[in-house]
Amino acid sequence: MSEAATATLAVPVNERDHVMGPANAPVIVVNYGDYQCPGCQQRHRSTEKMARELLDSVRLVHRHFPLVKSHPHALRAAEAAEAAASQGKFWEMHRLLFLRPDKLRDRDLRGYAKEIRLDLETFDREMASGIYADRILKDFYFSLNHGITGTPTTFINGVRYAQSGVELVATVKAIVEEQVAKRLQ
């Protein structure tokens, strides 16, 4: 198992987070990501595969960390994900945004909203109002002040890991096996 960095997760998983997986999962993976970040796209593919393989043992959490200076569409994409979340479809939008990182202009985001069958009137109103931008940016600056400096950044059970997607999946599998063994003792 690769050595973990000493950094720990500043904010525990809470009701504001986007979560997939059982509440009692022995392993919690928190990803900080940006929809235009190539590394995040690779990490998304790895964690999506991991979620399918370890469905009952892992809880996935996504937190926005849009690097707006280098990724001009990342904030709007995060807003679209939040607008989808308000209609119960965060993960559907999240997946599309990572699958199509070169198509994140407003017209593209609206097309994705239509594709996942969001109420377009509500989506359009929320996107026009910018109601999610302030929260996303506040979370970004809070995270920045607590040691998150780039993407992708991943924490497993509260400890920061700096690994490639493949290595990360192997680490999570090892931690799941370790946690399951502890429960059986």
Region spans (language model):
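Short secondary-structure boundary/capping elements
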Residues: V11-P12, Q42, R135
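Residue-level signal for pocket-adjacent positions within structured domains
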Residues: T8, V13-E15, T122, I156
